[in-house]
Amino acid sequence: MSSTQVGNALSSSTTTLVDLSNSTVTQKKQYYKDGETLHNLLLELKNNQDLELLPHEQAHPKIFQALKARIGRINNETCDPGEENSFFICDLGEVKRLFNNWVKELPRIKPFYAVKCNPDTKVLSLLAELGVNFDCASKVEIDRVLSMNISPDRIVYANPCKVASFIRYAASKNVMKSTFDNVEELHKIKKFHPESQLLLRIATDDSTAQCRLSTKYGCEMENVDVLLKAIKELGLNLAGVSFHVGSGASDFTSLYKAVRDARTVFDKAANEYGLPPLKILDVGGGFQFESFKESTAVLRLALEEFFPVGCGVDIIAEPGRYFVATAFTLASHVIAKRKLSENEAMIYTNDGVYGNMNCILFDHQEPHPRTLYHNLEFHYDDFESTTAVLDSINKTRSEYPYKVSIWGPTCDGLDCIAKEYYMKHDVIVGDWFYFPALGAYTSSAATQFNGFEQTADIVYIDSELD
């Protein structure tokens, strides 16, 4: 987008913005008052080749070594039941790199990791060491964090609708920060935890998100006055505002609008209801590695306009998948095969949608199987061993002659990992697939449906160490 186009799009705005931090998009821009201008900014960012993704694939060799070592110890013809179960490789070095990238891109925003995303103890411990705080939504999650000798002031109880006994428990453990979005919740808090530091959760436009949350949580802006009035009448402590624009959003103008709406609530609380100045803005979660540059650019713009440096407001966020999705690789064993024709088959693995790939159902993810081990040979280095889509130029049927559907181990017909995939190799029983980037909302929601245990082992590596 040329500077002339930027100027024309922003002609109605009067404020000037400093350059985008930590990127090569350094020309000055005026603040963004309309959706078209934000859309143009996002197009510019998507087309800017200088804004590169974090090179997380540099860890591949160590991941392969760990996969190879684990599989090399398994003989599926003689092993005990369960020894050939699926397992994860967790790269703690990837978590470190992602944290450093967060600090670089969003230095003002303190992350509170969403424990529900992946409650692995070693990941939680590492994040705590790095200075990350925690977003908990239940007694169990609070317990998990506190059991690691983490101070309760590093927890936000980010569930707007809480069980009364959990509120009492939070009070007994001095967990003070808590979200709400309705009057009834305020009455419970007044009764069981009246000293809470409350964050009013507002609804957002998450219509482009894959995982929408405002259909369930968040007070609409037209109803904010009801909650502010109740806060004042009950004598409770309103500390700030929170929101969540959903996960997998394709339009980050929703972030800008949410920050703008939060500013409205801040001003309304002080000017119309005489409440003490609010001190916390919680910008929620939904951050994804693949779209981090776009979402953070818009977020920085919005914060600089509505909550500039020195405004006296602490900015926090609730990232989950951002820190763990690309840090975990799942390995799954081929347990059966049903041939349909010469080059077409149904493949069955020992993990599926009721296990560590429940993210297919609940999180709208599409795991990408790759060939790890075929016919006694490893193929990890071939990142193009499989494809979901054929075309006439780059990925042809002659290169990928074998068409398969991939299924989980349970007896439910819903347990399908991929309805159509194309393979370079004719998969056989005893082979292994690996699925990269399966660290978010996978093991945390696995079930034991049909009697299949899903306590997948985790092998830890650290690609940041020599």
Curated annotation (Swiss-Prot):
Pathway: Amine and polyamine biosynthesis; putrescine biosynthesis via L-ornithine pathway; putrescine from L-ornithine: step 1/1. Its cofactor is pyridoxal 5'-phosphate. The record marks 244 as: Stacks against the aromatic ring of pyridoxal phosphate and stabilizes reaction intermediates. It is found in: Cytoplasm. Inhibited by antizyme (AZ) OAZ1 in response to polyamine levels. AZ inhibits the assembly of the functional homodimer by binding to ODC monomers and targeting them for ubiquitin-independent proteolytic destruction by the 26S proteasome. One of its GO terms (molecular function) is ornithine decarboxylase activity. It catalyses: L-ornithine + H(+) = putrescine + CO2. Keywords: Cytoplasm, Decarboxylase, Lyase, Polyamine biosynthesis, Pyridoxal phosphate. Pyridoxal 5'-phosphate binds at residues 247, 286, 318-321, 441. The active site is at residue 411. Its EC number is 4.1.1.17. Catalyzes the first and rate-limiting step of polyamine biosynthesis that converts ornithine into putrescine, which is the precursor for the polyamines, spermidine and spermine. Polyamines are essential for cell proliferation and are implicated in cellular processes, ranging from DNA replication to apoptosis. Present with 688 molecules/cell in log phase SD medium. Homodimer. Only the dimer is catalytically active, as the active sites are constructed of residues from both monomers. This is Ornithine decarboxylase.
